[in-house]
């Protein structure tokens, strides 16, 4: 199970962000694979796409591609929208605005873009790891939002 990630602001640069969100994760996955781990579950991001013009989504997409290349018997990519896990020690103004609108306008926002409980993401990751279904599986944000209030 991997939920490692940072922000460009926290890491200080795009290069440092890429080191944490791509290099560290690929290195950890490679070590796990070489040690005989048959499955890997990643908390990625809605919109992850190696061809994206958005740096964050591009790195997430490149990471997903790299993990697929490692040949895990079971690989699950969880792609939540904006994460709602309660207050953070640091201020993330854009995230706070997104959560404020997302929770108040929930019924007007397509399920794909609604904020997702960190508990729902953790539950989906745990279930995927325990099921260990062969192949590559993607759990999109809209299926995670259906479990809000249940997790």
Q: Which residues make up each language-model segment?
A:
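NAD(P)H-binding glycine-rich loop region in Rossmannoid oxidoreductase-like domains
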Residues: 1-27, 31-34, 129, 133
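A short helix->loop->beta-strand "cap" motif at the edges of active sites that frequently abuts
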Residues: 35-38, 71-73
